Regions:
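Residue cluster at the C-terminal edge of the helix-turn-helix DNA-binding motif
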Residues: 42, 59-60
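Beta-hairpin "wing" of winged helix-turn-helix
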Residues: 26-31, 60-68, 74
Length: 237
């Protein structure tokens, strides 16, 4: 543990080592931290000691634990976005449990419409994400999002089932500033109705919007379909 301070308790030495690795970029923002077993072997200590070090990193917001997945490097804007009322925090505040399932991820050309929307070339790539948001295991909304790849190099490497898209944008250097949205009601297709445990033709709340950064650059187009009985939750993505 060459880069540790010897007069500190072992778990604090390890915490400092891991924090320094995060600061240096050895563990990039959004990436998974090695497992407790791997770290215990590396530092020649017990899992309990590693867990104590990780607990401190969680408290400081430098990492986030996700059950069944592991620990991920957090971001300095995390607390701010949670306070802004994101899906995860809004649901947690209600006493329920949120989860996100990634249905599909791909890249596609912008084409004329989205090139004009984002101010990019028609042959520039968009990162397309389709997600299912759940509360206590029950599906409540489907969201389709398009993001210009040239604005967020490496976005496909962030686990967006762990980090919200707004957190991800911050991680990659662009802070969302404002959104222009419109609300409507539409009948669900058979595919979307099946995902939401509804019948084809049932009505859903539709929110479509464009998000901008502080410079006025459009960074995200999103469209979501939400079950009417989930309307008690207010959140943005």
């Amino acid at each position: 543990m060459a880069d540790a301070v010897e007069d500190l308790p072992v778990y604090k030495q390890i915490r400092r080592c891991i924090a320094e690795r995060i600061e240096r970029g050895d563990y990039p923002t959004g990436s998974m931290i090695p497992s407790e077993n791997e770290l215990a072997e590396e530092f020649g200590t017990t899992r309990l000691t590693i867990r104590s070090a990780m607990d401190e990193l969680v408290k400081s917001g430098q990492i986030r634990r996700v059950q069944g997945k592991g620990a991920f490097v957090g971001h300095k804007w995390f607390d701010e976005h949670e306070r802004r009322g994101g899906f995860r925090q809004s649901v947690l505040a209600s006493g329920a449990t949120p989860s996100v399932r990634i249905l599909a991820r791909s890249k596609r050309y912008a084409g004329p419409y989205y090139a004009d929307l984002f101010g990019i070339a028609e042959d520039d790539l968009l990162y397309s994400v389709r997600r299912l948001n759940c509360i206590d295991g029950e599906p409540v909304s489907i969201e389709m999002t398009l993001i210009p790849c040239l604005l967020f190099p490496g976005i496909e490497g962030v686990d967006i089932s762990v980090f919200s898209l707004f957190e991800t944008y911050d991680m990659l250097g662009r802070k969302p500033d404002q959104s222009v949205e419109k609300l409507d009601i539409e009948a669900l297709s058979a595919r979307d109705a099946s995902l939401l445990n509804l019948e084809p033709g049932d009505l859903a709340l539709v929110l479509e919007g464009l998000t901008y950064d502080s410079s006025g650059q459009a960074i995200e187009h999103a469209k979501s379909f939400t079950r009417g009985d989930a309307g008690g939750y207010t959140y943005n993505y």
